[in-house]
Amino acid sequence: MTIPNTIPITPELIAGHGLKPDEYQRILDLIGREPTFTELGIFSAMWNEHCSYKSSKKWLRTLPTKGPRVIQGPGENAGVVDIDDGDCVVFKMESHNHPSYIEPYQGAATGVGGILRDVFTMGARPIAAMNALRFGEPDHPKTRHLVSGVVSGVGGYGNSFGVPTVGGEVEFDARYNGNILVNAFAAGIAKSNAIFLSEAKGVGLPVVYLGAKTGRDGVGGATMASAEFDESIEEKRPTVQVGDPFTEKCLLEACLELMQTGAVIAIQDMGAAGLTCSAVEMGAKGDLGILLELDKVPVREERMTAYEMMLSESQERMLMVLQPEKEQEAKAIFVKWGLDFAIVGKTTDDLRFRVMHQGEEVANLPIKDLGDQAPEYDRPWRESGKQAPLPANLVAAPKDYGQALLQLVGSANQSSRRWVYEQYDTLIQGNSLQLPGGDAGVVRVDGHPSKALAFSSDVTPRYVEADPFEGGKQAVAECWRNITATGAEPLAATDNLNFGNPEKPEIMGQFVQAVKGIGEACRALDFPIVSGNVSLYNETNGVAILPTPTIAGVGLLPDWRKMARIGSANDGDKVIMIGVDGSHLGQSVYLRDVLDSREGPAPEVDLFAERRNGDFVRSVIRNGQATACHDISSGGLAVALAEMVMASDKGLAIDLGEGKGAPHALLFGEDQARYVLTVPADVADFLCANAEGAGVPFRRLGTVGGTALTVGDLISLPIQQLRDAHESWFPDFMEGRGELAAE
């Protein structure tokens, strides 16, 4: 009994596949006939935003992607950066936004699984994960359910697979009510001379399917990820993939073992658009055709059509081009790990993508036009309007500074994330040196006495909305600053660019300006972008998310014994601020959460100052002079000091002294390129003299000691009172306790 592959191609079917009339006409011109149903599915998957980057490619090319340590930049499964001693770090961040809104547990879990596969496909063993999460406003009826499901999914997969979650972000805003963001990051370590790529080489070589069996889960997932949501969202539940972290753990071990044998010519994980995308990418990159025999694909459901097999996004699967003489050795490894191993095709020299099913050719398409020569758009865009200046004297000061600070540290967006990260295994593998809650996660490099890597993920969407160019710069600068605050040298970054509908010129303008800002900051800070992901159409019923270009970065610590933490100050240490006095209250959390206003421009990022101040701070830490360090970001100096007090369990006596400007601007201003350092009292004068000599602005703030944070006569808060406010919001919210949760 044959399975039908013939379905009439109607305008409704074409539109349902996300193809515009002009794109369908391009298909007709390209192949000179009507496509089969399977071919329509293949074009739909390969020409959508998720796989082709057709709206963003033009602008992504402007980003700096090279540097002395960059081994592999964008275009592969993940970026690769040299960390000395013949080792490299392999990392990437990507989104699983649309599936996680529809089915939060599986959407988030398979997001983690997908990014881990991207890393070990390259030959690297994963050593760290992070996730940047954005949810709707806390009192939206779906938010608590989504937070619970996503956090369980991230933890369930990462913990079972065995990778520590070392950092991330969780934020709430009404603009994410209809589209949450789940951006997952993973990093692994490999030998620099043993990196595996996806470019197929050689004609007539076997194309091998590895891993789990193919089912109907995730069919059309990539197409869904390239569309806006509307009222029919619940119908999309079947397009969410289902993950199994134990199978993935076996796949990791089998792949790394196979890579030792010299059998692998090219390897690609099956992610978006499954078998279609992995086969096309391998062939197109190597200027080769691919012939697939679907009757040989391992399936776990009956009567699957060619269309379903080609577009299934079942998890834990790989595609590989193999040295033919190593076939039996390779197969034995996968059988040992309980995984499928099937030769499902071969490479050809005709640049065609041909798919056979039940003896019939169901697809015969030009492979380059599906892959690296897919359509590309130069969409119309316009710049965002500038926000009017907002001098500090036009912003009301709080009646009670202590109360304002308690309100900030206990707010939805500034409170402790302990409830979240305690559900993640942060210590597995035994190399974690800094856990979530500080500036960056730090993980020791196995087999090396002193080397470690620092990881951070950052973006301030309210800044990007107010000024996409400065907001793009700030996301890069804050990531660079967080890594620097541990004493690490920032090496390279990965971007995850989440925006609304690019067909709207104002949204496309946000994207273009943010990418320009990211590029400028990366060039100024020698912080190249080596991998990334773009997620567009994050809109529901015409309401777009806040523009959210997440930047995740990696830094190198040659000696982790000289690393700085935010909570390691000693009694009697002196507190010194590096950078200018706070003055900028536009778009600050003080303005938003205390005064309920969202006005003013985003803070400007002076990249020269960012570099100068950061390099100075790093040298202080590496010279062993700093006992603690924390960067100043959302909430300004006051929140940074409060976080240090809570982390160290030691009070601070602060005197703003000669600070120029209004106290609320000094305390809550969100000016950039700033850090708080604590140093032994006998080092303070020396450090200040060095800062002066290097042209680095600084201010002596006070002394470590006592059991309270005091700032002149403005603030006097016992550590426990700060901690109670900081730690209570999240558990209260998740347990639905009273008014607190609805604030």
UniProtKB/Swiss-Prot annotation:
Matches recorded under Pfam families: AIRS, AIRS_C, FGAR-AT_linker
EC number(s) from the headed UniProt entry: 6.3.5.3
Binding site for ATP: 53, 92, 495, 532
KW Lipid metabolism (keyword) present: no
Biological process terms in GO annotation: 'de novo' IMP biosynthetic process
Gene: purL
GO molecular function, one term: ATP binding
Entry annotated with the keyword Transit peptide: no
This protein's GO CC annotations: cytoplasm
Residues the entry annotates as binding Mg(2+) 1: 94, 533
Binding site for Mg(2+) 2: 118, 269
Annotated pathway: Purine metabolism; IMP biosynthesis via de novo pathway; 5-amino-1-(5-phospho-D-ribosyl)imidazole from N(2)-formyl-N(1)-(5-phospho-D-ribosyl)glycinamide: step 1/2
HAMAP family, sorted: PurL_2
Keywords carried by this UniProt record: ATP-binding, Cytoplasm, Ligase, Magnesium, Metal-binding, Nucleotide-binding, Purine biosynthesis
Subunit structure: Monomer. Part of the FGAM synthase complex composed of 1 PurL, 1 PurQ and 2 PurS subunits.
Root EC class: ligase
Membership in a protein family: Belongs to the FGAMS family.
Binding site for substrate: 95-98, 117, 241, 313-315, 535
Membrane-spanning ranges: none
Stated name of the protein: Phosphoribosylformylglycinamidine synthase subunit PurL
Catalyzed reactions: N(2)-formyl-N(1)-(5-phospho-beta-D-ribosyl)glycinamide + L-glutamine + ATP + H2O = 2-formamido-N(1)-(5-O-phospho-beta-D-ribosyl)acetamidine + L-glutamate + ADP + phosphate + H(+)
Top-level taxon of the source organism: Bacteria
Localization per record: Cytoplasm
Active site per UniProt: 50, 96 (proton acceptor)
Coiled coil location: none
Role: Part of the phosphoribosylformylglycinamidine synthase complex involved in the purines biosynthetic pathway. Catalyzes the ATP-dependent conversion of formylglycinamide ribonucleotide (FGAR) and glutamine to yield formylglycinamidine ribonucleotide (FGAM) and glutamate. The FGAM synthase complex is composed of three subunits. PurQ produces an ammonia molecule by converting glutamine to glutamate. PurL transfers the ammonia molecule to FGAR to form FGAM in an ATP-dependent manner.
UniProt lineage: Bacteria, Pseudomonadati, Pseudomonadota, Alphaproteobacteria, Hyphomicrobiales
